[in-house]
UniProtKB/Swiss-Prot annotation:
Top class in the EC scheme: transferase
Domain DHHC: 171-221
Gene encoding the protein: PAT03
Protein name: Probable protein S-acyltransferase 3
Family to which this protein belongs: Belongs to the DHHC palmitoyltransferase family.
Upper taxonomic lineage: Eukaryota, Viridiplantae, Streptophyta, Embryophyta, Tracheophyta
């Protein structure tokens, strides 16, 4: 009888898997649990390729359209240049052909570097710390609580930090269970909090943020140059032909189509390039540009033209906080649900409020306490201390990117 009772009991174990600067804690039975790659247990909406080595957004299929819009006219131009080579002046035409091919190759390279890499996703908080009403009075500084439906848990929805002498409010993300660092935002399409979030680009199928923004700048710049290149040399090929221009155009319809196509395209991609060069020169993101314009606030990240450009284009890209090929237990009790089922998490309140998904309320039958990720409050406080300095030392303090502040933990291979 005693052995039977012992066999019925399940001895629980805790598995701790570091993910970036977060620790995944999962409760499981003592029996062997199969492990899977971390990207297979991913709770966001991203799609993966090559065993988790490449990460895309949920709308990655738009890459086919973007590749076609770039590749089709570029290939047509190259084929047309081969025809012109046979008609004479091979050195000039070969040079134009080789330069166009290299520019197209660079454009596709920057497209993949933008779309197929981690844009700066902040790992979701997997630790839970339940606070009662009187457990920690230092966190009850706001009249607006995350737990507006959970009276036993008090979490201030916003925290004030100081960046370059300006007060910045950092918000609590109810989906990722963490306080977002300055300049970070939650992408409702990918369902992730992202460092220095600029926007979600449907043309590349990925968030544009801290770790891929320089490549995005190079991508749209090379696309603009490619449009101008094809436009100019298509005109040159028409002008170089003997006879009247209108007759030459009627005989070379392909070049005319390329001229019209690139003329229309350059207004879109060129305008986007100019806009982002303006954002880069003022050290703003697209999200901040519209927000500051609406709120009529001053940009706290301005450092001067040269320093702004250096920070955006030439600063060292921080390593990813994700190790998507790490092995994690297949059964994870402390799951944070994805966008489609985020309100079915094992750790949620009877009515959960999501600030990022439009404040949707979903009721559950059994009320549970919401896990509170307060570990990164100390990190955010460090940001406030580092940036609350005198004017003479602000430039030195602003050399570090406030959106990337946490230390990294190596995941098991």
């Amino acid at each position: 009888m005693q052995r039977e009772r012992m066999s019925k009991k399940k001895i629980s174990q805790v598995h701790c898997i570091p993910s970036g600067d977060h620790i995944l804690m999962t409760a499981s039975s003592s029996k062997h649990i199969p492990h899977i790659r971390f990207y297979k247990a991913w709770k966001g909406n991203n799609r993966f390729c090559c065993g988790g080595r490449l990460i895309f957004g949920p709308d990655v299929s738009s890459l086919y359209l973007t590749s076609f819009l770039i590749g089709a006219p570029a290939l047509t131009f190259c084929i047309r240049m081969l025809v012109w080579i046979k008609r004479g002046d091979p050195f000039f035409n070969y040079t134009v052909l080789a330069s166009g091919f290299i520019l197209t190759l660079l454009d596709f390279t920057f497209l993949m570097l933008t779309s197929a890499r981690d844009p700066g996703i902040i790992p979701r908080n997997k630790t839970s710390m339940i606070l009662e009403d009187d457990s920690d009075s230092s966190l009850t500084q706001s009249m607006e609580w995350v737990n507006n439906k959970t009276p036993n848990l008090k979490i201030p929805r916003t925290k004030d930090v100081f960046v370059n002498g300006y007060t910045i409010k950092v918000k609590f993300c109810d989906t990722c269970l963490l306080y977002r660092p300055p300049r970070a935002s939650h992408c409702s399409i990918c369902n992730n909090c992202v460092q220095r979030f600029d926007h979600h680009c449907p043309w590349v199928g990925q968030c544009i943020a801290r770790r891929n923004y320089p490549f995005f700048i190079c991508f749209i710049s090379s696309s603009t140059l490619l449009c101008i290149y094809v436009f100019v040399f298509s005109w040159i090929n028409l002008i170089r032909q003997p006879g009247k221009l209108w007759r030459t155009m009627s005989d070379d319809i392909v070049s005319v189509i390329l001229i019209v196509y690139t003329f229309v395209a350059v207004w879109f991609v060129g305008g986007l390039t100019i806009f982002h060069f303006y954002l880069m020169s003022t050290n703003q993101t697209t999200y901040e540009n519209f927000r500051y314009r609406y709120d009529k606030k001053e940009n706290p990240y301005k450092r001067g033209l040269l320093k702004n450009v250096k920070e955006v284009l030439f600063a060292k890209i921080p390593p990813s906080q994700l190790d998507l090929r790490a092995m994690v237990p297949e059964e994870d009790d402390m799951t944070i649900a994805s966008n489609d089922s985020e309100y079915e998490s094992e750790y949620t309140s009877s009515v959960r409020y999501d600030t990022e998904m439009g404040g949707k309320l979903i009721k559950r039958d059994s009320p549970r306490k919401l896990p509170l990720p307060t570990r990164n409050l100390d990190d955010i406080k460090d940001i406030s201390d580092n940036y609350d300095r005198s004017t003479t030392t602000r430039e030195d303090a602003s050399d570090r990117d406030p959106s990337f502040f946490s230390s990294q933990l190596d995941l098991p291979k």
